[in-house]
Amino acid sequence: MWGPDGEYKNGNLRGVINSLDHIKDLGMNAIWLTPIFDSSKAEGGEKLQATGYFTNNYFEIDPHFGTKQDLKELVDEAHKRNMYVFLDGVFGHHGGVTTPSPSGYTIDCTITGNDRNPDDHGNVRYPQSLDYFKEVATWWIDNYDIDGWRLDQAYQACQNGHNYWLEIRGAVDSLCQKRASEGKKWGTLGYMVGEDWGDAATINKGVFKDGGLQSAFDFQGKERISGPMQKVDSPGLENGFADIVWALRSPRERGYLNDSVMPNLFQTNHDGYRLADHFDLKDPHYYEKQMTRFAVLAAYNGPITLYYGDEFADRTLETTGGQPDNVARTSGHLTPRNSGEAELQSYIADIMAKRRSNPAMWRGKPEFQLTKVGDVSALVVRKTDEATGNEVLIVFADGDTTVPVHRYGGVDVDAWRPEVIVVKEPKF
């Protein structure tokens, strides 16, 4: 992986295998690997090769990262820990693929625009390349038991008024249903989440169009909660806790196509500044303000993503040679460097454990109570899961206070460190 210091970061599949227990202990139930396909001979030089996003062979592993056996071990070990594994698929551009798929399909490499950007310079033409990428999407599931895909610049597969994710997702769904009918546990989820960088309206007419994809990253939610992707001039929450109310409403209420789609909320990804960069290290509530953002993640209905290193408040501003789309690609580590990082890690693990064991956290119907306690602003989010009777409270405050909660009582909250309370345990 090419990083902001102008050098390789030397990460590999073995390093991920060695990190699985750490990831599991954070409360995660899935891993997204940025591209691991062979890019070692890709066009454009080593900086493009090292990103992984310009592959030269979709059916081989980049030797810098390891081998197919390493991937198989990683997937098997993740599954032993009840974690899914998602690969990163770049199905709209590549770095000079010349070999056919195992079934003999090829890519039409004509320089091609797309419905979002007719002047784009993708080098995958649809529908001519459709069979090739249907095979990529299904081959890794059927041969390596992966559980789904993160899809880079997914809008590039929307061409000539047609959303070709409809066919690719259909192929994945059919395979996963077949594998499930055969009694297989893994390689049956078929989760596919698209990167269609924009607001809800952009995604609706892009990868969600005509039911192509069912999940896409929630860029609008990310920027509202934790600030811009490629600037650090705002930490988000510019409208106070009202922005949290907005983020926790249903997809339709936030402008998405309908409530069957699944926006995926995140606070950092590999294309922008890290969450911690938006906060002043000298702020006495530096770590707690990040806890607030992670509490929003934990309370979000639908899928969420946590970027490696954010559990330790890793930063990027100190790096050199960085561009806005690579500053977050920093070297990973598995241990905190100070007590603040240790406390943040522990907080995240705790609230994610509560999310995992309380369905109200990830699918419950929310009620909101915005209030003032003296000079302190507070927000109470009550979430109830109808199927299990599970009920939880998430209480936010911008100062130390006791927040009066309807039908519960007073909740002591430290500034910017939300409390998550299980009011009623789920009955399954």
Annotate each PLM feature:
Residues 268-274:
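Active-site neighborhood of divalent metal-dependent phosphoester/pyrophosphate hydrolases
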Residues 1-145, 167-172, 177, 202-203:
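Substrate-binding/active-site clefts of carbohydrate-active enzymes
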Residues 2-15, 278-287, 407-408:
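Short, polar loop/linker segments at the starts of domains and inter-domain junctions
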Residues 79, 135-136, 142, 152-259, ...:
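Active-site-proximal helices and loops of the catalytic beta/alpha 8
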Residues 35, 87-94, 153-155, 194-197, ...:
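A cross-domain feature marking catalytic cores of carbohydrate-active enzymes
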Residues 297-312:
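Conserved short secondary-structure transition element at the edge of the structured enzyme core
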Residues 31-33, 85-87, 149, 192-194, ...:
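Hydrophobic faces of well-ordered beta-strands that scaffold small-molecule active sites
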Residues 28, 145-146, 213, 302-303:
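A structural motif
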